[in-house]
Amino acid sequence: MKKVLFLLAVVSLLVSPVVAQAQDQPYSGPPKVIRIIREEVKVGKGTVHEANETAWARTFADAKSPDNWIGMDSTTGNNEAWFVSGYDTMSDMEKRTIQALNTVPALKAIDTKYSSQDGEFVSSTRSVVAVYRDDLSYQGLKTNVGLFRYLYVTTVRVRPGHESEFVEATKISRAAHEKAAVPERWSVFEVTEGMPRGTYLIFEPLKSMADVDAFPQTHGKVYQDAVGDDGRKRLAELNSSATISAETNIFAFNPKMSNPTKEIAAADPDFWTPKHAKTPVAGTKKGAEKPAGN
């Protein structure tokens, strides 16, 4: 699926199509700030790690934590679990995570309990903060993410001093998508902390793997005509000069490890809030290190 064109390699190809459906529900859109806790799960520890995370999420929800998050597992790439939280501002993130843990003893106790177990299941963690770039996004997440089951995540590294070329290429791509009315959507987040400067995350929600299969048809002649020969030439130039690397992986949403917002859970309650039996767990998770979010 990879193509030399910057647009296709970095945006189009990496975001497979999602056809709008009548069941799509109104959604307030992507958060302005996201926090991602990335955990690399040890080989053979996936089941016990999930049990620990499930108990953590349920206990936080029962304690009325002000923080929310979506948990997801990698299906490609490294064996990772991601926990993505959304906020209006950095101050909002501080209030709902650090301040909440420091001022509500029950939340602190829960966090301490479950975070202490992570060392047995996880080999490394990383906390990443990124801000939403509406100017680079196509349709954003105008459809409630709670209706989806997978997330295509493309991580783009841009050469220092070449951010303007990345922006130009992405806008060329978006314009072509708009002209061709391509039935997909993506949200671009610029990393501000936790990864090298010039890192961008492109999120594309998928309802099923059939969305990936549909990519060639979705980006067929109508789309190629919208890009045009001049556009393809320019994109190839931008790809060569602007990008260090682009990597795409697919994550599966894991409702058991999630503490979703009411808005997300309401999109599909049977999926996001199934009846849980009490999970016997050993442990704890990384409190302030583990967020909660959208």
Question: Which residues are covered by each model-predicted region?
Answer:
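Small/flexible residues
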Residues: 4-5, 37
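Positively charged n-region of N-terminal signal peptides that target proteins for export
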Residues: 1-4, 21
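Short S/T/G/P-rich N-terminal loop/turn motif that feeds into the first structured element of a domain
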Residues: 21-294
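Bacterial N-terminal signal peptides
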Residues: 7-16
